[in-house]
Amino acid sequence: MAAMSEEGSCVNFKEMMFIDNTLYLIPEDNGDLESDHFGRLHCTTAVIRSINDQVLFVDKRNPPVFEDMPDIDRTANESQTRLIIYMYKDSEVRGLAVTLSVKDGRMSTLSCKNKIISFEEMNPPENIDDIKSDLIFFQKRVPGHNKMEFESSLYEGHFLACQKEDDAFKLVLKRKDENGDKSVMFTLTNLHQS
């Protein structure tokens, strides 16, 4: 018995067995098989700006917001505007799997647990043994624009967005409006590693 992958190679199975009403297929050689997980690769640093050129500002005491900020102010607040973007190897093809973190004394990583955006005090994990995580977002290029969007791996169809709430522009997680929703589009300006 064999199973075909997308590349045309196959996996030969030597045995099948039922354990607790679950069918297990035992391959002859599982050296080429990958488990469903995210494995951390390397990182880059960037400033994230909204479609209105506002800079993402992370203050651990408050929800992340977008602010009008000249470069001199952004540089003065670099620990709160410099995002550390860790890239992850993904066992599925869904976009570039990333985490977003800031280091202002201690490392904090963006989470969308329960669809609420917050930076949790933690280092991005080396490995995540699942295909979904509140920490992983799929960074994708927006067709026809020089912009990026970030889809939650945990909540399919939900994206990071810049949304006005009260008197502030906040970073939120929302379902993307398919009619040209620009609130989910961001500009990334890569910075030199420090």
Curated annotation (Swiss-Prot):
Broad class of the protein's primary localization: cytoplasm
Post-translational modification note: The pro-IL-18 precursor is processed by CASP1 to yield its mature, active form. The pro-IL-18 precursor is however not processed by Casp4/Casp11 in rodents. The pro-IL-18 precursor features autoinhibitory interactions between the propeptide and the post-cleavage-site region, preventing recognition by the IL18R1 receptor. Processing by CASP1 induces conformational changes to generate critical receptor-binding sites. The mature form is then secreted and released in the extracellular milieu by passing through the gasdermin-D (GSDMD) pore. In contrast, cleavage by CASP3 inactivates IL18.
GO molecular function: cytokine activity; interleukin-18 receptor binding; receptor ligand activity
InterPro entries given in the database record: IL-18, IL-1_fam, IL1/FGF
Annotated site (Cleavage): D36, H37, D71, I72
Propeptide feature: residues: 1-36
Gene Ontology CC annotations of this record: apical plasma membrane; cytosol; extracellular space
Gene3D superfamilies (alphabetical): 2.80.10.50
Secreted as UniProt keyword: yes
One BP annotation, GO: positive regulation of transcription by RNA polymerase II
Keywords: Cytokine, Cytoplasm, Inflammatory response, Secreted
Taxonomy, superkingdom: Eukaryota
CDD domains named in the record: beta-trefoil_IL18
Location of the protein in the cell: Cytoplasm, Cytosol; Secreted
Assembly: Forms a ternary complex with ligand-binding receptor subunit IL18R1 and signaling receptor subunit IL18RAP at the plasma membrane. Mature IL18 first binds to IL18R1 forming a low affinity binary complex, which then interacts with IL18RAP to form a high affinity ternary complex that signals inside the cell. Interacts with cargo receptor TMED10; the interaction mediates the translocation from the cytoplasm into the ERGIC (endoplasmic reticulum-Golgi intermediate compartment) and thereby secretion.
Family: Belongs to the IL-1 family.
Its job: Pro-inflammatory cytokine primarily involved in epithelial barrier repair, polarized T-helper 1 (Th1) cell and natural killer (NK) cell immune responses. Upon binding to IL18R1 and IL18RAP, forms a signaling ternary complex which activates NF-kappa-B, triggering synthesis of inflammatory mediators. Synergizes with IL12/interleukin-12 to induce IFNG synthesis from T-helper 1 (Th1) cells and natural killer (NK) cells.
Name by which UniProt lists this protein: Interleukin-18
